[in-house]
C-alpha cells in the first residue's frame, strides 16, 4: 500500500481505539503524531534493493514482532513528552498510557495493510501474502483510505459507546430478550 493509505487507515483505527480512553481530539492528535513516523520508519528502513535493483521488503521491519517495536518507538517519545508536560497540569490532561497502546497497534496495522499485497509480510522469516494485489492498486488503496476516514468520523460523532458499561448491558439485554 502507499504511505498515504497506511497513514489514513492507521489514524482512523488508532483514533477510534483511543476514544475508549480519552476524548476524540486527544486521540486523533496522538494518532497523527504516532502514525506518520512509525509508517515512515517501517517503509523506509524496511526496503532494500535486490540484485535487479528492485525494492523489496525485508524481515527487518515487516514481521509481526519487529513491527511492534518500530511502532512503539514514536509512541514512547510522545508518551515521555506528554507525561513530562502533564506534571504541571494534572486535572487538564488525561493519563497518557493509551498512547503506548496506540504505538503497539500502529506497527501491526501497517502489516495488516501490507498483507494483501504482492510483497506480503514475513512470518518466521518466510514471506506470507493473503492476496496478490499491486501496492499501488487504486481500488484497494481507496478502500483503505475510505475505511480510515469512516473510522475517524465515527470516533468524532460518538462512537465511543464502549466507555459506558450500561449502554453495552442494555444493548445485549434487549438483544437477548428479542431472540
Feature-to-residue mapping (PLM):
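N-terminal membrane-targeting hydrophobic helices
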Residues: 1-179
Amino acid at each position: 500500500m502507499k504511505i498515504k493509505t497506511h497513514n489514513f487507515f492507521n489514524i482512523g483505527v488508532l483514533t477510534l481505539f483511543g476514544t475508549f480512553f480519552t476524548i476524540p481530539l486527544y486521540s486523533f492528535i496522538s494518532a497523527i503524531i504516532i502514525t506518520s513516523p512509525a509508517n515512515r520508519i517501517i517503509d523506509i528502513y524496511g526496503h532494500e534493493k535486490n540484485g535487479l535493483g528492485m525494492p523489496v521488503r525485508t524481515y527487518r521491519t515487516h514481521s509481526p514482532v519487529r513491527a511492534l517495536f518500530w511502532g512503539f518507538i514514536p509512541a514512547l517519545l510522545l508518551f515521555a513528552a506528554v507525561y513530562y508536560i502533564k506534571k504541571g497540569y494534572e486535572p487538564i490532561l488525561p493519563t497518557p498510557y493509551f498512547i503506548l497502546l496506540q504505538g503497539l497497534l500502529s506497527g501491526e496495522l501497517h502489516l495488516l495493510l501490507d498483507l494483501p499485497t504482492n510483497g506480503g509480510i514475513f512470518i518466521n522469516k518466510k514471506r506470507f501474502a493473503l492476496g496478490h494485489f499491486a501496492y499501488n492498486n487504486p481500488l484497494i488503496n481507496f478502500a483503505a483510505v475510505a475505511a480510515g476516514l469512516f473510522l475517524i468520523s465515527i470516533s468524532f460523532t460518538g462512537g465511543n459507546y464502549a466507555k459506558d458499561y450500561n449502554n453495552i448491558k442494555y444493548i445485549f439485554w434487549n438483544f437477548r430478550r428479542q431472540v
